[in-house]
């Protein structure tokens, strides 16, 4: 087990991210274990599933949506295998992987592979049903797919990538909004999309009032669907307060534990945590 007092003061990264914020907001001590001590993190087959679906979507979009579904699935399969093999290199015994319901670690790898294939198909099908929703092209001529961004919140730099920025019609006028592709069961809420929207407003002077998640669904679901969020209350100042709070926690090493049975169950570093709730 690891204790904060046993370590020397760490050198935090120079930038923040949505994922850093989310971890600190959920449990500062988890951030300490994951990002500072970098203890072993329990693998789960849903991680390569998500990575591979995102990669396949990116490849298809960059083809101008002309790549055949079979070729997109082949790209998915390649990315899935690479991601799984990388995780197996670190934790070759799948008995130590997360199980999912009745499926142990090994069985869940195969199950998640099949779920991801269906999600790739649903992703392509979604845009076949709504072809007017196209990827926004940035002023530099590049389509906004995996768009790298950086926002400065009074000295706190936030970096990351936006899955995609799409054009759509709002009140009979052309508008844009950030979209995140989700392979899990639940959307991630407003904060992530609000950060993306703020970047688009700061960098490109775009008016962005909403964002959404493209939910590729569970296995057996027929179609992907959209979950929208109104982002109008997320101002630059409000986001600045949140990121400055997270930055303060990290830089001043205020890694207080916040144990909770539900959170701890899905925490990949719970096995190294002295505060774990059962």
Language-model-detected regions and their locations in the chain:
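A short beta-strand motif that forms part of the nucleic acid-binding face
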Residues: 37, 181-185, 215-217
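Non-catalytic protein-protein interaction segments used by genome-maintenance enzymes to assemble
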Residues: 139, 144-198, 204
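A non-catalytic, helix-rich entry segment at domain boundaries
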Residues: 56-147
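Metal-dependent nuclease catalytic regions and adjoining charged, substrate-binding loops involved
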Residues: 5-6, 154, 188, 201-278
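Charged, glycine-rich intrinsically disordered N-terminal tails and low-complexity linkers that flank
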Residues: 1-75, 79
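An acidic intrinsically disordered interaction segment
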Residues: 7-26, 154-164, 232-240
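Charged, terminal alpha-helix-loop-beta segments
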Residues: 118-122, 142-148, 152, 262, ...
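Catalytic phosphate/metal-binding cores of nucleic-acid and nucleotide-processing enzymes, i.e., regions
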Residues: 24, 32-36, 139, 158, ...
């Amino acid at each position: 087990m690891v204790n904060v007092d046993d370590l020397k003061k760490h050198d935090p990264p120079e930038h923040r991210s949505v994922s850093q914020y989310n971890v600190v907001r959920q449990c500062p001590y988890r951030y300490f274990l994951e990002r500072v001590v970098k203890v072993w993190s329990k693998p789960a087959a849903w991680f390569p599933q998500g990575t591979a679906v995102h990669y396949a979507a990116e490849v298809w979009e960059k083809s101008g949506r002309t790549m055949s579904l079979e070729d997109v699935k082949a790209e998915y399969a390649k990315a899935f295998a690479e991601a799984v093999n990388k995780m197996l290199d670190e934790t070759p015994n799948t008995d130590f992987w997360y199980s999912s319901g009745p499926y142990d670690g090994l069985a869940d790898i195969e199950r998640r592979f099949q779920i991801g294939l269906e999600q790739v198909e649903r992703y392509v099908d979604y845009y076949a049903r709504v072809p007017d929703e196209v990827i926004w092209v940035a002023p530099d001529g590049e389509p906004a797919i995996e768009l790298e961004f950086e926002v400065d919140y009074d000295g706190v730099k936030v970096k990351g990538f936006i899955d995609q920025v799409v054009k759509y019609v709002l009140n009979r006028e052309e508008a844009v909004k950030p979209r995140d592709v989700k392979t899990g069961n639940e959307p991630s809420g407003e904060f992530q999309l609000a950060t993306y929207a703020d970047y688009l407003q700061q960098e490109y002077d775009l008016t962005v009032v909403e964002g959404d998640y493209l939910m590729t669904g569970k296995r057996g679901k027929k179609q992907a669907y959209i979950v929208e969020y109104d982002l109008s209350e997320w101002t630059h100042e409000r986001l600045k307060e949140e990121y400055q709070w997270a930055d303060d926690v990290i830089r001043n090493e205020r890694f207080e534990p916040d144990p909770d049975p539900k959170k701890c169950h899905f925490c990949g570093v719970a096995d190294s945590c002295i505060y774990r709730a059962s």
